[in-house]
């Protein structure tokens, strides 16, 4: 243990580089970026992860002069890498919030919003519900272990901050594909409920046109709400597998980006 701490003090500059990237990731990744998680916990966790990945992230000793302009640029680049990684993880979870937004208005919850503590924005109620389910799935599949123990280490081994200056087109294409996949997955989640609600609205419109005295429009809002919750209770157990595939698909997409950027080193 003493040797480990001696090695840490001898490579303090590299340790701070690793800690800055992990610390920036902590402040942007869902679940850990919320205000309920204290900064002390995030700093301690970032330091622990940086200490664990340091021998594997920098197997060969590097001589970097502290407090030089080059070292400051390295710190800024590592912070940018952590922020972009956390932003991509946030994009994955935005898929589930967007899916809830697609059918919230149709079911009558268009104006019912609540504060999303994860994204720190106002989010429709159903989007918040699906996002919460996705968080539980993320914890169930050991997403934190995959992200912080595997993903962080692979990012250190594959990418440094100067790669972004040489691979801007690859990054732009990657985030474009990620946003396209976000919309596609959100539509896949919301489409069954949107289709059922569309049939209900069309049926009520035809019945109201055929028999105006029935006044079905006054009963339409409770009916759509009840049908939506019944459909969610039926299809949600089957959608868990889709949630898992979306999360793992996002991790695989990010790993492919690291491999592609690693070739530029």
From Swiss-Prot:
A Pfam family of this chain: Bac_export_1
Any GO BP annotation: bacterial-type flagellum assembly
Query: What InterPro entries does the record tag this protein with?
Result: FliR, T3SS_IM_R
What are the UniProt keywords, alphabetically?
Bacterial flagellum, Cell membrane, Membrane, Transmembrane, Transmembrane helix
Q: Domain of life of the organism in this record?
A: Bacteria
As for subcellular location, the record says: Cell membrane; Bacterial flagellum basal body
Q: Name one GO cellular component term.
A: bacterial-type flagellum basal body
Question: According to its record, how does it sit in the membrane?
Answer: Multi-pass membrane protein
Transmembrane regions:
14-34, 44-64, 73-93, 132-152, 182-202, 229-249
What's its job? Role in flagellar biosynthesis.
Regarding protein family, the annotation reads: Belongs to the FliR/MopE/SpaR family.
What NCBIfam families does the record tag this protein with? fliR
> What is this protein identified as?
Flagellar biosynthetic protein FliR
